[in-house]
Amino acid sequence: MYTIMAIKISPRTVAAPKVQEILTRYGCIIHTRIGLHEATENTCSTSSLILLNLTPSAEEEIKNLDNELNSLEDVTAKLLNL
């Protein structure tokens, strides 16, 4: 089984530091982290998407991570179990 979390951050510059702090605390349950945002030579997107591959057996920690992220005003987190 795979437990994937998608995290949308907008505006990225406002919410990203707090998201980073939360993800650092839960680092032991994060297998893979991929950050996506549009960037060109002259501009950088104000929103971003982070994809996490989480330890499926860490159900309580995943629930806490989800709750903490969704408590932030500019952040939306969704879980997907495959």
What does each model-found stretch correspond to?
Residues 1-82:
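Long, contiguous binding/interaction regions
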